[in-house]
Structure formats: structure tokens, C-alpha cells
Curated annotation (Swiss-Prot):
Cofactor note: May bind 1 zinc ion per subunit.
The protein, known as: Protein translocase subunit SecA
Membrane topology classification: Peripheral membrane protein
Similarity section: Belongs to the SecA family.
Amino acid sequence: MFDTLFKSIFGSSNDRYIKRCRTRVEAINALEPQMQALADEDFPARIAEYREQAQNGRSLDDLLPEVFALTREAGKRALNMRHFDVQLVGGMVLHEGRIAEMKTGEGKTLVATLPVVLNAISGLGVHVVTVNDYLAKRDAAWMGRLYNFLGLSVGVIVHGLSDEERKEAYGADITYGTNNEFGFDYLRDNMKFYPHQLVQREHNFAIVDEVDSILIDEARTPLIISGPSEDSTGLYRRVDDIIPKLSPEAHFSVDEKARTATLTDEGVAKCEELLGIDNLFDPGNITFQHHVLQALKAHHVFRRDVDYIVTPEDQVVIVDEFTGRLMPGRRFSDGLHQALEAKEKVKVEAENQTLASITFQNYFRMYKKLAGMTGTADTEAVEFQQIYGLQVITIPTNKPMVRKDYPDSIYRTRREKFEAIVAAIGELHKSGQPVLVGTISIETSELLSAMLKKTGVPHNVLNAKHHEQEAEIVAQAGQRGKVTIATNMAGRGTDIVLGEGVRESGGLHILGTERHESRRIDNQLRGRSGRQGDPGSSRFYLSLEDDLMRLFGSDRISGLMQKLGMEEGEPIENRMVSRAIENAQKRVEGHNFEIRKTLLDYDNVMNQQREVIYTLRRETMMEADLEETAVEFMDDLFDEIYGDAEQGKGSEGDDAKAYAMARLRDVFNITRVLPLTDGQLPDRETARGAVLSILDELKRDTGEVYRDILRFFLLEEVDRCWKEHLLNMDHLRDGIGLRGYGQRDPKQEYKREGFSLFQEMLFRVRENLFRALTRLRIQREEQAPPEELKQEFKHKEEPKSLNYSGAQKETPSAAPERRGEPKVGRNDPCPCGSGQKYKKCCGA
């Protein structure tokens, strides 16, 4: 009540923000005559002048009016496009690190040039993030004319570039690319060996186009670089053969909401009989159990031409549920992709093991300043604020919106609904009004296409199978009498321009064949019509058999429709029913938000560990002399070995001193210079001196290559142990939910045990480093020249068999050796959570 009264008097916070921007818009407009008087060659000189002022301490906020005015004039001359006043406001929103919600056709691509130019002046680089390679190349070439006119350099990052080309693109003032390419380049940089191999600069400022698609829709899917693991392809085929012999309900049940399958007791017994094993739940048979559940999902949850397609080359390719695009190169996780390959009787590819991973949430939060643009963000404003700290500002349209959004037409069955859709399309086609038909799957678009062919209505189909003609089909969709069927239009990035005489016949009509589980995707489809004040209309056709209605809202809506007494083929258009559907969508959105938030909570634990490892790698790469680091690592190990001996800790069957001597032999190969024949543990300083003498001998034998040897072995061990650690964390994550049954918080347990595993991993790095160094011998009489030695100790090149995917990976492996209590090394992060190294905090 109070909020409503406050808004009626003072306006919403959004209105007040827009009002505050008007003063600066007037200041920019006042500078227009001054900029119009400049000669073309004056523009790069002005940018150089502003760059110098910024370097001398003048703030970008202070420079904003002049730079925006200069960019607006450059747009007129280079592109023949002038920024509207509302676009200037959009530019201010982006510069301040917020999200600008702008309707379709309001010129988001042009708006981005304003903050891009302003922030490029700093010389620290600006990243413009798009949803696909086509848009990255298109926008870089299109807006590049404006940037080049101003004397700024532009780079573009797309799939298939070499490291040299990527480095050059990142070195430009402005870099366009996709979210996947930026994320994978970050991960790849943290697998490199020498500083000159790094391609990315620091993460200064990013503008994310279609920000809702990238930061929300794709946030459930982490970026993963993986390599091949053990081959278990035969097992997938063996398990797939038994699935047709299992009966629904009797042997298994499917939860469509959660997209899971579960075996019944009878199903477990049947599987044991068919697989010829005694106990499916025996630890030795855990792999069978996992494969059976994945095979059930492949057969009864995932649908061909909806969730994936099979290409003419017999490859299973994922279909993006939000955009309808194919995602070649990405694979479902947890062996699900292999289960689908077995189901479709194509070649089953080997499983992969995670080498590096990050979520989009944590990648984009690394930027000093982050901003975004989209046509539909307001429905997710709370999530943007909570997770990314980004405020959504709705920018007014340049011309009033006149599109008519009609109420939903709801039918009892899918058959009735599709018959009504075909009839409606036929009527609209006769009248000359173009129709864009939105479907949520390839299966539906092809079904509708077949029905239209029978009635003789000419039409185009745009889905993941026909993406080559995408831009051409979309561009023609606004012509008189055109009928275009398209899977989800999110991120298509091509405006639909109305043809001659179309405005008079009502503009483009949007016909939705089903509600998506996200209101935002529905709004994106609607937003294709009514751009820049054009006329248009929209209507959704639904049935009680649609997935959303069936799973999330059917009982209540079905009851309402029975009360209203519907006849066969008769639609209902009722606001109460539409509200019930919207509430069902809100429930699904809330459910998906919780999934993303949980993913982030768990990834935050991994993120802290990732930062420590990547910082260690970066310091190892950059450090000219690693000898001091090696000695510190050695002292950490001595602290542990001699500390355990003093406290009487040993392994089973060994006394503490015997165990300490065994560790000295194993880790440091100490008997090479110090015999331990009398069974006495040498004092710490004697043992330390012995290890230093081994290192000194290695240093004398290798000369200047010694530093490269230290770097090589340290990076090798960090990478190998980190890879194993990622696998162990995957296993921990998979089983941690069960802790809830023991009245323990799974997230806290994951954090606690994850920290323990991480500390052990850091100690394994130190141990393995010294195992390698103290056993390395150089034959003096056959000693290689320094250059050959350098080549010998160069880091291995990136394996060619790496996979880049957007899903979590899990493969079974033996549990790591566990110590009783994790030790904290002096260079490790302090357990108190201060963020400092232990030696500078509690260990000082």
C-alpha cells in the first residue's frame, strides 16, 4: 500500500533514474553543433586527447558527455545512424555497470558503441559478448566502421582461431566474441606454460548482449575442458540392450518434472537377472547401476528432435532448449551422451575426464565492471541483483508500442489446438498478414509444417536443422502473406522488417504454439513484432496436453475448464486461466532459479580453490627464479614429517619415527646422499641439508636450465593433481546430498570436506615435485647442450583430443589416500578465511 502511494507521488526507482539521466542527455545534445564542425581527420585526434586526459587522472564519468557526443557524430558519418536520446540513456546505464532492458528493434547494437568507446579510452580493453559467432563477426564488422573512424582497433574471437590470432584480437581496444570463447580462453590460459603463450588480458569491462540468455539460461551449464578417460563403450551397449525388456511402472518410474528415472524393487531384480549379477547395489556394481539409470533417461526422458538430433554423419548433437540452435561439440554429462548414442545405434564415443571448469556466473564476476543488454530482463531482475549485483533499468521506447497482445486460446487436446492453429494461419495468409509461428521443439515445427503442406499453405521452416538459411528466412518473415515457422527465436539477432503494405494489414502476427517454461522466452517471441512503433499482434494457442500444463498446472486449469463447460474444438479465452498458466511458469522459474543458485553455492567453493591454483600457476609462469619457492615447499614438507614424528603419528603398523624415515626415503630419496642404516631418524637440519645438496648437484649439472626444470615439474604436478582433485570433488558433490538425511547441511559438509581434499592435493603437489627432482640425474659425460635441455623441459602442447563442453563430468576412480588431519602449508590459503597466505596470517 505504502509502496504504491510512494510510486504514485515520486514515480518508481526506474522512472527516477531515467529522469536523472535527462540532464546529461541535454549536455550531450548541447555539444552536437561543436562535434558537427569537426573534420573527419579530427576524430582520432580527439580520442587520443581524451585517452591522455584519462591517463592523467580525469574520470570517465567526467569525459562521458564529450565522448558520447563525439561517438554520436561518428555514428552519423560512418554508419549513417544517429543515436536517439533514449539510446544515450541506454549507454549511460551500461557505462555504470547495469542492465539496460530495451525492446526489440530499439538499436541495442548501436547503444553499446557509446560505453564501448568511453571505456576503450582507458586502454585496458573492452569485451562485447554475444550469443554466437555469426553475431560476433557481424557486429564487429558493422560497428567496426564507427570504431575505426575514431581510430580505435577492433578484434573478434570466434571458434577455430590460432593462439596468435586470439592474442592479437584481445590486444585490440575492443574485442567481440561469444561467452563460450571468452570462458574457454580463460581456462586454456590457465593450462599454458610460458607467459608469451597467454592470450587474454585482464578482465576490465564486459558488455553482455542478450544478457538473460547468457547469465541465466546458460548459467546452469558450466564450461568444461575435458580429456579422454578409460574406455567403457561396450558397457553402454550391453546396458542399452536390456532397457526394452523393462516395463514402465512395473520396473521403473519416470519423473518428468525432475527429468529423472528410478528403478522399482522388481526392476532392480530384473536388471540383476538380465545383466547376470548378484547385487546391483554392491560397491563393485555401482557402475552398472549408474549406466542403467542413464540408459532409462536416454530412452524415456530425452526425446529425439526435441532434446537432441542425429545428424546425417550419425552424431548425436544437443539442441539448445532456449534458442533451438544445435550445439555441436557439446556433450551431455555423466555418461548420458553415451547412453543416447547407444540408444540411437551410432558410434559410442569414449567418456571424458574434467581438466578445467568454470561457471559463467564466476567467470563474468571476475570483470571489474559488468553490464548487459536485452529485450527481456525485468522478470529476472531479482536474480540479476542477488547473483551478479546488477540492477535492471527499463529504457523507454523511442516510439510508443502499439502491438496488440490477445489472450491465450486454450483447447483440451493437442489435436484440437493444432487444427485451430492451421485454420488461423490459413486465414491470416489469405488476408496478406505475415505470420511468425513460434514452436518450442523441432518435432513440433516439423509436425506443423506437414499439416500446412496438406492444406497447401506455402511456408518456411527455421529450426536447428535449417540454420544455414537462418538470416535470409528471418529477413523475409515480414513480407506480405509470408508464413514462417521457427523454433525459439531467442538470440536470433536479426530484425524482421515489414514489407510493403504489411502495416495496413495489421503488421506481423506472432502465433505461439505452446508456452515455454520461462515467461521471458514467450516475451522474446512476442517482441519480434511491434518494433519501433510498427503495428503488430500476438496470440498463444495452448492445450491441456502441453508439457507445461500437464506437469505444472493441469489439475486446477482442467477443473476451471470443466466448470466453464467446453465443447470439442471450442477454445476458451479467460483471464483467470491465463493467470493460472502464468503462475505455473513462475513456479518453474523459481525452481530453475534454485537450481542455478545451488550450482553457484557449490561452485563458489570450487572458485576459491580455482583462484588459488590459477594464482599459483600464474606466479610459477611469471617468476624468474623458483628456487625460493622450491625451498619453501621443502620446508612445508619437513614441518609435516617432523611434526608428525614429534606427536607420535605414524601409519598403521609403523612407529612414528620409522614412518618419518619412510617418508624421507619416498619423498626426498634421501638415502641417495644420507644412509639411514642405523634405524635412527636424522635431525631436521641434517635431513634438510641432505636434500639441499641433491638440489645443488642438479643445479650444477643443468646450469641455467635448472629454473626451467623447476618450472616444468611444478606445473606438471599442479596440472596433474588439479585434474585428479576435480574428479574427487565431482564424486564428493554427487554423494553429498545424502548428508541431509543425517541432519547435516550438505553445502557446509561439501565446503568442509572440499577444503580438506584441497589441502591434501596441495601437499601431493609438493611431494610429487620432490619425488621427481630428487630422482632426476643428468649424465655428465653425455650431457646435452643447454638448448637441447631447454627443449626437453618445455611443457607439453595442448592435447588435440580435448573436448569443450557445457556439462559436469563424472568418471569413477579410486579414492585418494587420506591423512588423518590436513596440514596447512605456509603458502596455502589460511583456514581462517582471511584470503591471505597462512604464513602471513595465523602462521606468522
